Amino acid sequence: MLSPRRTKFRKQQRGRMRGMAYRGSTINFGDYALQATEPCWITSRQIEAARRAMTRYIKRGGKIWIRIFPDKPVTMRPAETRMGSGKGSPEYWVAVVKPGRIMFELDGVSEPIAREAMRLAAQKLPIKTKFITKAEEYI
């Protein structure tokens, strides 16, 4: 699973997910892409599950690019702990995804195969997504 090798600080504030994604919202590597239509935190486990689903479906052909990286730590307190005594310890990592963000790109396969692979990947993610092609993007 994906996680940063080292970070400047162990813990982060939660922040807010307002507005659209302007960076990372165009297809740069492949011919087909999966685009987020809602804001969400996507965990490294969800990214890995989606990647596996796509890889298993396209088998040997094609190349996959993961365009999001989980660089935000999410902290949790132990169960049945009283309030106070500081922030919890980091438990897992998330990628902050805004609407319009390209999450996965795919190349080297036909459009029906790419569409089905992206559909399988989208089922593993907690948000609504959209399948887009490079041809559609520049109309």
Swiss-Prot record:
HAMAP family: Ribosomal_uL16 (MF_01342). Pfam families: Ribosomal_L16. Binds 23S rRNA and is also seen to make contacts with the A and possibly P site tRNAs. GO terms for cellular component: cytosolic large ribosomal subunit. The gene is rplP. GO terms for molecular function: rRNA binding; structural constituent of ribosome; tRNA binding. It comes from Rippkaea orientalis (strain PCC 8801 / RF-1). One of its GO terms (biological process) is translation. Part of the 50S ribosomal subunit. It comes from the Bacteria. This is Large ribosomal subunit protein uL16. Belongs to the universal ribosomal protein uL16 family. InterPro entries: Ribosomal_uL16, Ribosomal_uL16_bact-type, Ribosomal_uL16_CS, Ribosomal_uL16_dom, Ribosomal_uL16_sf. The keyword tRNA-binding applies. NCBIfam families: rplP_bact (TIGR01164). PANTHER family: 50S/60S RIBOSOMAL PROTEIN L16 (PTHR12220), LARGE RIBOSOMAL SUBUNIT PROTEIN UL16M (PTHR12220:SF13). Keywords: Ribonucleoprotein, Ribosomal protein, RNA-binding, rRNA-binding, tRNA-binding.
